[in-house]
């Protein structure tokens, strides 16, 4: 019965909207409170602002009054959609808010012509994995997620440096 009461209450008080960079500080505070969610170097304000501008309207915020209680970063590369940092305030978990944010992300991805989405869930995040399974996501087999930092190993190629490497100085 409690879940039904909370869900009915949520429909009247929880509002969702587009994630704005002005929401960044509150979103980070929420990310820190959600078990299993890791904040990485690419989650700084400048990087998130760039992500939001490349993927307008896809990332979502859920508020209860003026308090942010849910966040999802969503984008695509033109072929596949990606959902990053889905987070729901622990007090609101189990109310359907996470699924609601995912559905809104999917709606935006469909509108953009994207047919498939991918998420990464940490191996040790059992609760997160169970959430995604309940949302009908499946683990992909036959692939391993791999990554590498893109760091400058040499100075950027300026016109002067390009010319000097060609012997055209």
Regions found by a protein language model. Give the residues of each.
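Conserved acetyl-CoA-binding loop-helix of GNAT-fold acetyltransferases
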Residues: 94-107, 134
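Helix-loop element at the rim of GNAT/NAT acetyltransferase active sites that forms part
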Residues: 18, 28-42
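Conserved GNAT acetyl-CoA-binding A-motif
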Residues: 109-121
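A short beta-loop-alpha structural element at the N-terminal edge
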Residues: 13-27
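Conserved beta-strand in the GNAT
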Residues: 61, 67-75, 82-87
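Conserved beta-strand-loop-alpha-helix junction that forms the acyl-donor binding cleft
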Residues: 119-128, 147-150
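Active-site rim helix/loop that mediates acceptor-substrate recognition in acyltransferases
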Residues: 37-61, 65
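A conserved beta-turn-beta hairpin within the catalytic core of GNAT-like acetyltransferases
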Residues: 75-84, 93, 139-143
């Amino acid at each position: 019965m409690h879940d039904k009461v909370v869900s009915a209450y949520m429909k009247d008080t929880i509002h969702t909207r587009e994630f704005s960079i002005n929401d960044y500080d509150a979103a980070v505070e929420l990310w820190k409170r959600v078990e299993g969610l890791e904040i990485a170097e690419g989650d700084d304000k400048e990087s998130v602002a760039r992500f939001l501008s490349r993927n307008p309207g896809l990332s979502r915020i859920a508020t209860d009054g003026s308090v942010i209680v849910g966040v999802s970063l969503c984008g695509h590369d033109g072929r596949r959609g990606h959902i990053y940092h889905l987070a729901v305030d622990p007090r609101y978990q189990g109310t359907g808010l996470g699924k609601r944010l995912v559905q809104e992300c999917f709606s935006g991805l469909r509108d953009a012509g994207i047919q498939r989405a991918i998420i990464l869930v940490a191996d040790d995040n059992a609760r997160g994995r169970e959430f995604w399974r309940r949302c009908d996501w499946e683990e992909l087999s036959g692939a391993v997620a791999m990554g590498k930092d893109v760091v400058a190993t040499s100075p950027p190629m300026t016109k002067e440096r390009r010319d000097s490497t060609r012997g055209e100085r």
